[in-house]
């Protein structure tokens, strides 16, 4: 069977090729009756519609927006935060007849979550993407994929605060959120806190101690900095591995099993006059996502440890499961964040271009007065 074209469809309907083009690209130029007849005939004859790439060249727009995800697509579909964000974004974008192209990043092979290899196939996808604008979820604006998009003239919208006055972003005050959590725990007497973070560092399997410069997410680094400032005590950063309940539980189990982690180099021959400096076991665990925090609660319960009597637990994001688990957490309007990003993607003139969303501490049943040391066992 011959391939259907604009000309063959036009001949079948009895109109010009220009009228067929208007039916798809400028429907306001036709009567509803004529457009319906054209679309019905196209469906009957198997005409797929105008070529998207060709239409982009002619009209200067692709009628599609992209979302650059910091993880594989299979993970994004299981992440409550990503699902809620994409729901909000799609509600706005699809209402205007615009398509969404999801562009997940593979796990980096060089050990850096935010710096995939320059020849990565992910970057090729961005080079070839037929999109008008790109949302960048939890990645820096100087990420190679973002730089490629910018060089192509594609508008960018990020979900992290940028110092660039010309940039478009929708974010929360992550540093302020960390301060909120830190002040809440400090009021309860907590001075020794463990923080579970998602990471893909080479040593980033659940249960590895990290430094702040190893944090891949900008929002995570800001939250830890705010927490550390407010606590004024010992803040230990622990890799939670991938963002999952299982990883949070594994990291917490490692924390409970460790033999009082040294905080300074161990002398080659310890003596009574040169003891090994140690860190007290934390009285609180903060998951920088609710998912990791829920894993911590699960691990503590499996050891017969009471939350919050023996260990307090706090999360971030306030996903639906957090309320069900009575988890103390930072609430951020995830769905609203996606909606704001969608509006900025659609309209380059939309104001304001920089949206700081409100946050609040939701105090529930997993935080309480700090227990008296000694360390857990």
Show which residues each predicted segment covers:
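Amphipathic helical "hinge" segments at domain boundaries
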Residues: 36, 48-123, 130-133, 228
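Hinge/beta->alpha junction and helix N-cap segments in small-molecule ligand-binding domains
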Residues: 72-84, 102-117, 140, 170-180, ...
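N-terminal helix-turn-helix DNA-binding module of bacterial transcription factors
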Residues: 1-64, 371, 377
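Intrinsically disordered, low-complexity terminal tails and inter-domain linkers enriched
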Residues: 108-121, 202, 257-283
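Flexible loop/turn connectors
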Residues: 249, 258-268, 281-377
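Flexible loop/hinge segments that line or gate small-molecule binding clefts
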Residues: 137-176, 201-203, 291, 317-327
């Amino acid at each position: 069977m011959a391939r259907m074209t604009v000309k063959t469809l036009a001949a079948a309907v009895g109109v010009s090729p220009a009228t067929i083009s208007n039916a798809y690209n400028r429907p306001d130029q036709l009567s509803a009756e004529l457009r319906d007849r054209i679309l019905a005939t196209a469906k009957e004859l198997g005409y797929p519609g105008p070529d998207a790439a060709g239409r982009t060249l002619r009209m200067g727009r692709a009628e599609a927006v992209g979302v650059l995800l910091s993880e594989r697509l299979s993970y994004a579909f299981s992440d409550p935060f990503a699902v809620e964000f994409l729901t909000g974004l799609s509600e706005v974008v699809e209402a205007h007849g615009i398509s969404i192209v999801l562009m997940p990043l593979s796990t980096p092979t060089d050990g850096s979550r935010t710096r995939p290899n320059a020849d990565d196939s992910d970057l090729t996808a961005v080079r070839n993407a037929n999109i008008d604008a790109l949302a960048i979820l939890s990645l820096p604006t100087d990420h190679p994929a973002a730089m490629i998009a910018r060089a192509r003239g594609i508008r960018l919208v990020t979900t992290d605060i940028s110092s660039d006055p010309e940039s478009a972003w929708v974010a929360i005050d992550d540093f302020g959120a960390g301060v909120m959590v830190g002040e809440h725990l400090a009021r309860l007497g907590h001075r020794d806190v463990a923080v579970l973070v998602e990471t893909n560092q080479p040593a980033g399997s659940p249960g590895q101690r990290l430094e702040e410069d190893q944090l891949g997410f900008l929002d995570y680094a800001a939250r830890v900095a705010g927490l550390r400032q407010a606590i004024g005590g010992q803040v230990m950063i622990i890799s939670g591995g991938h963002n999952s309940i299982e990883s949070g539980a594994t990291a917490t189990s490692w924390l409970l099993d460790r033999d009082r982690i040294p905080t300074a180099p161990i002398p080659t021959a310890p003596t009574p006059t040169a003891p090994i400096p140690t860190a007290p076991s934390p009285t609180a665990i903060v998951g920088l996502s609710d998912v990791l925090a829920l894993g911590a609660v699960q691990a503590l319960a499996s050891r017969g440890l009471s939350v919050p009597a023996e260990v307090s637990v706090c999360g971030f994001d306030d996903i639906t499961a957090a309320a069900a688990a009575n988890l103390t957490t930072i609430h951020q309007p995830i769905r609203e964040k996606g909606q704001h990003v969608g509006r900025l993607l659609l309209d380059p003139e939309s104001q304001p271009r920089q949206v700081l969303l409100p946050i609040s501490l939701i105090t529930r049943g997993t935080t309480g007065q700090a227990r008296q040391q000694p360390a857990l066992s």
